[in-house]
Amino acid sequence: MPAWPRFMSLRRQYLYKALDKNHQKHPIKHPHTRFLSRLFCALAVLFSYSIYQSFRTDLKQSGSWGCEMSWMSPSYRRLEWTEFISTRYALYLYREQGLDSEDTLSGHPVLFVPGNAGSYQQVRSIASSASKQYYEQVKARERNVVTGKKIDFFTADLKEEFSAFHARTVREQAVFIQHCIKGILQEYTHLPQEKRPTQVTLLAHSMGGVVARLAMDPITSISVDIIVTLSTPHILPPLALERDMDSIYSLIRWRRQHISTHPPLISICGGISDTQIVSDSCALPFFQAGNNSDIAVFTTGIPGVWTAVEHQAIIWCHQIRWRIARMLLDMSSRANTTAKLVTAKEWLLDYQEDETLKEPRSERQHDYSVSSRNMTFIGLHQPSKAFVAQQCNGLERCRTVPSVMSLLPFPNNPSDPFPLPGEGIKPSEVMLVAEISLSSTNTVVKINASQYGQTIAGSREHHLVKGNSWSEFTITMRYRYIRIQLLFCIRPTHTSTFSFYCGTLLTLPRQSWHLSGDISIALMSCTTGVAQKKLLQRTGQICDSVPYGRSCMASRVGCCGSSVSIIRFYQHRSVRTCKGFKLILVGEILSWNSALERIARRRMPICIVLLLLGATIQSQLPDFPMLHTFFLGVNQLEMVPLVGILGVWTFGLLCVVSFHLISTCAIFTTLLIPFKILHVAIWSRNIWTGSAALVSTDNNFYYAIPPALLVKCASCGGTIQKRHVCLKACRIALIILIMSSFSVGARWTWILSPIANAVLILFVASII
């Protein structure tokens, strides 16, 4: 008799008796359970729909983005090294056709590291912009424009591997990057000793930033001056499916804290439009932002960009690639790391004025009467900081008054949404805001401004806002501009419509200078990421700028708004739903009456109470180490009910599995695939690309035990005597899995896989 039919006959023979006893012991005759099941189903559907609609609304209102297309003429030359250790990866030198004609290398080296499934050719956008700007500066030398070194862009071909899903791939790529850094520096041995570069700048996209940081061991870090990452998940991995991936992140944090030669890190994030990398994960941990060397900035906060950017578009978006290329050019001429960081902050955290407009060819001088010691001047359509203010009292000579200047977006069409979709803000659609402080009011202010646009003035008032909401006096009919100053924040970076990093000004631009209307202000908390909207009425020709200071701007919008933060910050929680789907596959999907009879009525209330108790303790101990990684990862007491709601939701996904009814056994032969589907995809791709490192893997044969037990049962017809013991242990393990799937936190998702496999082992053992 064939093995599989014999297994089916054995299964029917031994299971029917157990089923009869089980049904006699636990008859399902509870009418109120039917009502409870329908109520839970309705709540689950309603809650899921609310989350989906909240996310769509938030993404539609705040996630619009606009970028200009970039153009280039790329060419690549593969570098062949006699001592090249890898036959799997390759290294290329980028050259812009028509500009980079020389074959010898004489500039500053920059190595590009692509991300998950990324191509080495993605370097072309930034590299092309750097070449064009360099040769434009060369032509402008007669105009006294400072010219930095030329940039030599190298790019690593990592064969478009799935580094986000496989920790071993990340480690192998990091080793390759270490050897690339050594090889790149050897390419400059033809230069005199004093002109040879001693350090390489790393430019990485997505998971390439994790690879670049992992390559920074004590030896390699000496040869790297700056690491610039684009949309890189620095805090949490995109999918924490392996323990080794968590070990990689722990090693990166340890090296940043303990290696004195570790290069500074500049993290550029795409914001809410980046649906692949969660914005909170792209920010930097508190200990990194507090060292005054690492920088994290969102593209919404970069002057001249003012828009969120999609994950892949951050590479080719012209507004961003132009500033990154210009930043790299200016950094190449700086002698030390401190000066390079100052240059980076000028381009990313504050507007870098156009050198050709420092002294406008023609200026207009205007006199303004002083109405307050604190004055604000706004220059419309003024693309540079060509602004000089002088205080004159009629008796003494006029003296120059220091001013604090910043550029703000000024779209030509007041009815357009912001950020502008399509190509975004044009370079001419900006205005200059200058703030000055005067010694007295009995004077006249003379303004020398650029010939572009017009200049208007007004007084400036300060109001301090404390707590989590704005008081009544802040919502007046007088103000067109609201400027919010973030004085201190728990986290170094946070995202909002216009908020980008701590210690800077958040400016909400007006929509019309002529018509009254409403300004929709969307603020995101740095601790919860929940948006709060408030409408400010504006009328009249008022050009005041009102700073508000507080520790951390506000949040609290209720369940739907909270759902937005949950679904955005825990996008990878869908992995846990997949775990539940695996359990559903191995058993027959029963009615809710049967499922809730065993799980919901008896164990779920106790588990929910424990979850709520743990979330309450978490909210009362916000500074306790590692406590923020559990549950929702937030410390607000009002978020505790969401823990219970999501707990019921999680139970509803996982408790529909039955262990006491006949189910299809054919699915058991593929139990290995659901658990390691990503690794199977990686193996398949490696075979397709002809990789020689197929056996270099860290997979655990523990996951092969369930199908091995099935093979044993089908081949020899053996059974396990104490089936009821395995069945009871399986139910206990399932409860542990349900509790763990909700409470372990986003960082430790890899814990669920071995627990789920233990459930399957016990389940298979109970039916054979």
From Swiss-Prot:
It is an enzyme of class 3 (hydrolase). GO terms for molecular function: phosphatidylinositol deacylase activity. This is GPI inositol-deacylase. Gene3D superfamilies: alpha/beta hydrolase. Signal peptide: none annotated. Involved in inositol deacylation of GPI-anchored proteins which plays important roles in the quality control and ER-associated degradation of GPI-anchored proteins. GO terms for biological process: endoplasmic reticulum to Golgi vesicle-mediated transport; GPI anchor metabolic process; protein transport. Belongs to the GPI inositol-deacylase family. Disulfide bonds: none annotated. It comes from the Eukaryota. The chain crosses the membrane at residues 35-55, 604-624, 642-662, 663-683, 700-720, 725-745, 748-768. Its EC number is 3.1.-.-. The keyword tRNA processing does not apply. Glycans are attached at N291, N336, N374, N448. Pfam families: PGAP1. One of its GO terms (cellular component) is endoplasmic reticulum membrane. It is found in: Endoplasmic reticulum membrane. It is a multi-pass membrane protein. The lineage of its organism: Eukaryota, Fungi, Dikarya, Basidiomycota, Agaricomycotina. Keywords: Endoplasmic reticulum, Glycoprotein, Hydrolase, Membrane, Protein transport, Transmembrane, Transmembrane helix, Transport.
